[in-house]
A protein has these predicted regions:
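Transmembrane helix recognition focused on a "late"/terminal membrane span
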Residues: 1-6, 34-155
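Membrane interfacial helix-start motif at the N-side
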Residues: 9-26
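Short hydrophobic alpha-helical segments that form membrane-spanning helices or hydrophobic packing faces
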Residues: 27-34
Length: 155
């Protein structure tokens, strides 16, 4: 339960899970990095515009060069908080987190071109949708590795 709580606090803000785990330097570092990347990417404005339905304006308001750092920072902070709180003991349990980071990063890159049924989901909602294939791919690859891989695998 403690590990799941840390994930949810890390979803709220990268670094909060580490603070709850009493890893203050690491937590404050994640918060600082989140603030820098968020500010330099102009991400809060893109979030606001996306929720207001101004998806095309959100697409042009962000700095993709900075925002592409965000998914890896975000999902690594979640994994770290989860692991340090006692989760992630099973072999390859990091894979869903890692594949979420990969899929969300790719989703961010293709967001300007991702149009379904005339709807542009933009730089906020399309990458969020990409979490689903990230989790599924991570779980699938974990299952394959556990089934056919080395029995001495470690997390």
């Amino acid at each position: 339960m403690k590990a799941v709580e840390r994930i949810f606090w890390s979803i709220a803000l990268p670094g909060f899970g580490q603070l709850l785990n009493k890893q203050y330097v690491k937590g404050l570092t994640f918060i600082f990095l989140e603030f820098v990347v968020n500010t330099c990417a102009n991400f809060n404005e893109a979030i606001m515009l996306s929720f207001l339905g101004e998806t095309h304006q959100a697409l042009t308001s962000i700095d993709y060069g900075w925002l592409m750092f965000y998914p890896c920072l975000y999902f690594f902070a979640m994994w770290d908080a989860f692991k340090e709180a006692g989760g992630g003991k099973a072999p390859y349990s990091f894979l869903p987190f890692a594949f979420c980071a990969y899929c969300v990063t790719v989703g961010l890159m293709v967001a300007p071109k991702a149009i379904f049924f005339g709807i542009t989901f933009g730089p906020v909602f399309f990458p969020m949708i990409c979490v689903i294939p990230g989790i599924l791919l991570g779980l699938l690859i974990r299952k394959i590795l556990l089934t056919f891989g080395n029995e001495d695998a470690v997390a």
